[in-house]
Structure formats: structure tokens, C-alpha cells
Amino acid sequence: MRILIQFTKRHPWLTNVTIYGSLFASADIVQQKLSKSPTEPIDFKQTAKVGLVGFCFHANFNFFWLRFIERTFPGSAPLNVIRKVACDQLMAAPITISAFYTGLSLLDGERDVFKNLKEKFWPTYKTGVMCWTVFQTINFSVIPPFVRTAYIGVCAFLWTTFLCYIRNRDINEVTTRLLHAVPNIRGKMAFPQDQDDNKPADK
């Protein structure tokens, strides 16, 4: 472990970008496994495209963006953490979401490379604000700067799994499924007294 940390400190760009790109590709494989039947093969061409977008753009963008924002608002003081998170969501998030949708549309050879972006940007952005505000608050508060891109890569693994899922589906279908899932989750988490309240009264 000590050797890995030393290597990361000596070669932060190589380590962080490699980890980030690999996690991007892995996220697509997980998404395919979860959404396909067990007999359907993995589309490794699609995985390669996701990994390419992650490695060429997202990994490099986040590496240099995190260094820039740390120099602009140094340290982990609460006010600076708030500034970093706000800048990240207002400036970086729209860029990375746009790059994901348009980049994959270009690699897929779609005629209208902005179609997915126009349809899914706002739902994706609003969901991302809820997730990434938490991820980045932790990142800027307690994660050492030299491993921040790798940490964001782990968070991006979860986020990219979601992005790959909704990219290949109608946004209304995804929204409907989420809305149906919420009552089911709530029902499973109901407290005993809530369940008792739903029982018919004894005659």
C-alpha cells in the first residue's frame, strides 16, 4: 500500500487518469450486466467507447480541474469547501455531462449528436447536483489532493453506471421506474406502527 501511495505521489497524472478511465469502462460493464438478461453478451465495443470518453476527456478534465480549484480556494475550511462545491456544480458539471452525451453520440456515428444531450441534460444535471454535492463535499473536506481524481473516479463509477443506463433509454421511462420504485422502497422501510395503522380495524 505504501508503494502505491508513493507511486501515486510521484506520478499523479498517470495513476489518477488510468484509474479513472478503467472505472468508466467498468461502470458500463456493470450497467450492461444489470440491464441485460444473463444470456445476452456484453457489448465490449460500447464499453470501449465509454472507456475512451472517460480516459480522453473526463479523467484529464477532472485531474486539471481539481488542481485548479484547489489553487483557487485552498484548504478545507468550510467556506472554501462550499465555494469549491458550488463552482464544481455550476461550472464543471454542465461540461462533463455535455461531453459524455455528445462524445458517445459522436463515437456511435449518430446524425444528431446533440439529441441525447438535449433530451436528458436537465434530468441528469438535477440528479447529479443531489449526488455530487455530497461526493464533492467529502472530497474537498477530507481527501488528500494527490488522490482526489482517483476518489472522484470511484464516485464516477456509480454515476457513470447511471449515465450509461439512462443514455440507452427514454428519459420518461427511467423517471417512471424511479417514481414506481420510491413507494415500494418506502413500503419495505415502513415502521411497525405504520403497518399497524394500515390494518383494518377489529369489528
UniProtKB/Swiss-Prot annotation:
<dbReference type="GO" id="GO:0005778">
    <property type="term" value="C:peroxisomal membrane"/>
</dbReference>
<dbReference type="GO" id="GO:0061668">
    <property type="term" value="P:mitochondrial ribosome assembly"/>
</dbReference>
<feature type="transmembrane region" description="Helical">
    <location>
        <begin position="13"/>
        <end position="30"/>
    </location>
</feature>
<feature type="topological domain" description="Lumenal">
    <location>
        <begin position="31"/>
        <end position="49"/>
    </location>
</feature>
<feature type="topological domain" description="Cytoplasmic">
    <location>
        <begin position="1"/>
        <end position="12"/>
    </location>
</feature>
<feature type="topological domain" description="Lumenal">
    <location>
        <begin position="108"/>
        <end position="143"/>
    </location>
</feature>
<feature type="transmembrane region" description="Helical">
    <location>
        <begin position="50"/>
        <end position="69"/>
    </location>
</feature>
<keyword id="KW-0576">Peroxisome</keyword>
<dbReference type="Pfam" id="PF04117">
    <property type="entry name" value="Mpv17_PMP22"/>
</dbReference>
<feature type="transmembrane region" description="Helical">
    <location>
        <begin position="144"/>
        <end position="166"/>
    </location>
</feature>
<feature type="topological domain" description="Cytoplasmic">
    <location>
        <begin position="70"/>
        <end position="89"/>
    </location>
</feature>
<dbReference type="GO" id="GO:0005737">
    <property type="term" value="C:cytoplasm"/>
</dbReference>
<feature type="topological domain" description="Cytoplasmic">
    <location>
        <begin position="167"/>
        <end position="203"/>
    </location>
</feature>
<feature type="transmembrane region" description="Helical">
    <location>
        <begin position="90"/>
        <end position="107"/>
    </location>
</feature>
<dbReference type="InterPro" id="IPR007248">
    <property type="entry name" value="Mpv17_PMP22"/>
</dbReference>
<keyword id="KW-1133">Transmembrane helix</keyword>
<comment type="similarity">
    <text>Belongs to the peroxisomal membrane protein PXMP2/4 family.</text>
</comment>
<keyword id="KW-0812">Transmembrane</keyword>
<dbReference type="GO" id="GO:0005739">
    <property type="term" value="C:mitochondrion"/>
</dbReference>
<comment type="function">
    <text>Participates in reactive oxygen species metabolism by up- or down-regulation of the genes of antioxidant enzymes. Protective against the mitochondrial apoptotic cascade.</text>
</comment>
<protein>
    <recommendedName>
        <fullName>Mpv17-like protein</fullName>
    </recommendedName>
</protein>
<keyword id="KW-0472">Membrane</keyword>
